[in-house]
């Protein structure tokens, strides 16, 4: 176990020898000591982090905005809430994050924008959980994330919730075939990106996925979501126009309330079949405030509309 005084001794002797913590708790103590001495803009590159596997909440709700650009994070597997609620907006573009499995809430509510170090070339191919990763970011993202390899990710819930992304932002080519959960992924976000070629074969939960995200204009006609189970408010108040979704299979879905609220549908869905477990009320609410010709409604709904 590292002696916390090692850093203090090195400072007094002006040694350039790096401190090498083995555990997250030791790393936290060193960071705390340095920030107390030199303030939140201090340089922490004197810390050798090559043995650290867990960086969860390392700078959560911190004023830190110093230099950690040279950190070796090659063994880190967990970066949950690492910068959540923090003021950090430094350069971490050259980090090797290839072994990280969890990035849940990593930049949630933070000041990070990627302006001073684009993280678009990060190797995130092993990350399985990106839940709330950029949710509620304080400032618009300045990085594109275009080159991210997301083929291992299963959870993208709240990922860009209430986030504004810059003009360079482009996730159109992301591999999302393993994503199972995308609830509120783009809820109330400001993102203009074409997701028409996304393959969502594994998607199970998509409640509020695009709710109030009214900057999207892409066509979902190519989408196929055979495993979709719940999609309440999925496109509610997004303003998306649906040109042709006749081929969508909704027969296994049990959550459809307000799915197309405030949208426009320009295709005939009369042959759609609902799950026998769905109540009439749920079926009917699927198209609440939706602009769709009466004859285009699913046949199972038409009698319900007439009753009302």
Enumerate the predicted regions with their spans:
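Negatively charged
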Residues: 1-308
């Amino acid at each position: 176990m590292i002696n916390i005084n090692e850093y203090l001794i090195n400072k007094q002797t002006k040694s350039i020898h790096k401190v090498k913590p083995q555990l997250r708790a030791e790393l936290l103590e060193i960071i705390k000591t340095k920030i107390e001495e030199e303030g939140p803009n201090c340089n922490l590159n004197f810390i050798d982090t090559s043995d650290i596997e867990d960086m969860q909440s390392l700078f959560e709700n911190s004023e830190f905005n110093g230099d950690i650009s040279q950190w070796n994070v090659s063994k880190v597997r967990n970066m949950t809430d690492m910068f959540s609620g923090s003021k950090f907006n430094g350069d971490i573009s050259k980090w090797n994050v290839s072994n990280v499995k969890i990035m849940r809430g990593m930049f949630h509510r933070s000041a990070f924008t990627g302006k001073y170090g684009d993280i678009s070339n990060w190797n995130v191919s092993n990350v399985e959980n990106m839940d709330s990763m950029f949710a509620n970011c304080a400032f618009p993202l300045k990085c594109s994330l275009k080159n991210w390899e997301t083929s291992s990710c299963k959870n993208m819930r709240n990922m860009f919730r209430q986030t504004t992304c810059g003009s360079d932002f482009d996730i159109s080519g992301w591999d999302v075939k393993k994503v199972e959960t995308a609830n509120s992924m783009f809820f109330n976000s400001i993102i203009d990106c074409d997701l028409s070629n996304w393959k969502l074969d594994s998607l199970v939960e998509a409640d509020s996925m695009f709710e109030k995200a009214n900057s999207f204009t892409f066509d979902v006609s190519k989408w196929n979501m055979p495993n979709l189970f719940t999609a309440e408010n999925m496109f509610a108040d997004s303003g998306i126009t649906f040109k042709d979704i006749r081929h969508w299979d909704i027969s296994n879905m049990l959550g459809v309330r307000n799915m197309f609220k405030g949208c426009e549908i320009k295709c005939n869905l009369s042959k759609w079949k609902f799950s026998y477990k769905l109540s009439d009320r749920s079926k009917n609410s699927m198209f609440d405030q939706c602009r769709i010709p009466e004859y285009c409604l699913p046949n199972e709904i038409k009698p319900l509309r007439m009753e009302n």
